Regions:
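Conserved D-loop/post-Walker B switch-helix segment of ABC ATPase nucleotide-binding domains
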Residues: 303-310
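C-terminal lobe/lid and adjacent interdomain/linker elements of RecA-like ASCE P-loop ATPase modules
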Residues: 1-4, 255, 310-402
């Protein structure tokens, strides 16, 4: 599970930016968080809003960049330990609107939990070369942190959990040492960290191959869940198959006792989007994975988006700590009946063309009080009260077109 992610000098983000999935002490939806006693509780969902060009996608790309940098060398060497589902490579690009930062490293810091431990992974990159890297871990709820390894350019130090005598410290400057160790050695702490990175789902709607593989697999439970979820959302499908001749996914419906078939390509855009998204979301729920999806709401009715959010926020369905992080323009879903205040995030362009990221929970009113959990989040957002100025406020001021 993802606890916290921070990064600096990546694309539109110049300064250190922190994205936190640790649940704040809030009264609303207390029953829907992921309880992790004795450690801090975590959020199952986070939605990022903001204007086009504000930095929503770049925030997800920062996380994707870190994950793919670790996973790609392992995948290329066919040493993966977990089935990859739609991971994509994102290059490491610094903030370019400043002569200084354009030649400085990009930094990432990630806290995540897996297999009874909380890990801290740090990576500093200058374009595609590793400048510094470190991995530490401690037992969940524990106080003592164990050093796994530390890397400062060519100098690598190993912690007590690694048999130093048998470990090669000569590594390609473009390869993370975490990836190098995962490829060449069998080290429990490295294996656990590697499996977590590989389990992350990074969604690209340009590629539906992974979804087809899941839908057409022999896993009867997943097939049944996909059909059941589609039915729950008002899409009356009772089966599907793949036609090898036409290379098309065929959706099956029964009407008055007769089965009719319709090609996937002939379904509505919203139905196609939902069919494409559901398999990976159900896999994430079943296996406790992190799913990262850009513009999840595109072409989806708000009711369908709320259904997907509710799947992850339901502790009876989300029994393995699955998490969903996505960007959205769907203001109709920005409601106090859908989200906690710490589950809503905003990305907006600040000074010097640099993006800023903050949660609704962090915002203070003029009297220094937080936004109330009974507030009309969507209305106040459109009024520009949350700082991530939506286009409506910029176009219309004092009742006049600007």
């Amino acid at each position: 599970m993802l606890c916290q992610f921070s990064f600096k000098n990546f694309k539109s983000y110049k300064d250190e930016t922190v994205f936190d999935m640790q649940a704040a002490n809030l009264p609303e939806f207390a029953e829907n968080i992921i309880y992790c006693k004795p450690a801090s509780n975590l959020l199952p969902v986070a939605a990022i809003y903001g204007p086009n060009g504000g930095g929503k996608t770049n925030m997800l790309q920062a996380l994707t960049c870190l994950i793919s940098t670790v996973v790609k060398p392992i995948y290329d060497m066919e040493k993966t330990r977990t089935k990859l589902i739609v991971q994509q490579k994102v290059s490491c690009t610094p903030f370019l609107f400043d002569e200084k930062t354009s030649n400085e490293p990009t930094e990432f810091l990630l806290y995540f939990r897996t297999n009874g431990y909380e890990y801290r992974y740090y990576l500093s990159m200058l374009h595609d070369e590793i400048i510094a890297e470190a991995l530490d871990r401690k037992k969940i709820g524990g106080k003592r942190t164990a050093h796994v390894f530390d890397r400062e350019e060519k100098v690598i130090t190993l912690g007590s959990s690694i048999n130093k005598a048998s470990i090669n410290r000569d590594v390609n400057p473009k390869m993370p040492y975490l990836s190098f160790l995962a490829i060449n050695y069998d080290i429990p702490a490295i294996n656990d960290a590697q499996k977590w990175f590989e389990s992350c789902i990074i969604r690209s709607y340009a590629n539906t191959e992974a979804e087809l593989q899941i839908m057409l697999s022999d896993n009867k439970t997943i097939r049944r869940q996909i059909i059941s979820a589609l039915n729950d959302m008002g899409i009356d499908i009772n089966g599907y198959r793949y036609d090898n001749d036409s290379k098309q996914l065929i959706m099956q419906r029964t009407l008055h006792g007769k089965t009719y078939e319709l090609s996937y390509k002939d379904e509505s855009d919203g139905t196609k989007k939902l069919i494409a998204a559901l398999p990976i979301l159900l896999i994430a729920l079943a296996e406790g994975r992190l799913a990262v999806i850009d513009e999840l709401d595109a072409k989806l009715h708000p009711k369908l988006l709320r259904y997907i959010i509710a799947l992850f926020k339901n502790p009876k369905l989300n029994t393995h700590g699955a998490q969903l992080i996505f960007t959205s323009h769907d203001i109709a879903t920005m409601k106090n009946t859908v989200y906690r205040r710490d589950e809503i995030w905003f990305a907006a362009e600040g000074d010097n063309h640099s993006s800023e990221l903050y949660s609704l929970y962090e915002i203070r009113k003029e009297n220094n009080e937080r936004i109330n959990n009974t507030a009309a989040y969507d209305k106040q957002y459109l009024e520009g009260r949350y700082g991530a100025d939506p286009y409506l406020q910029n176009m219309l001021k004092d009742g006049e077109w600007q």
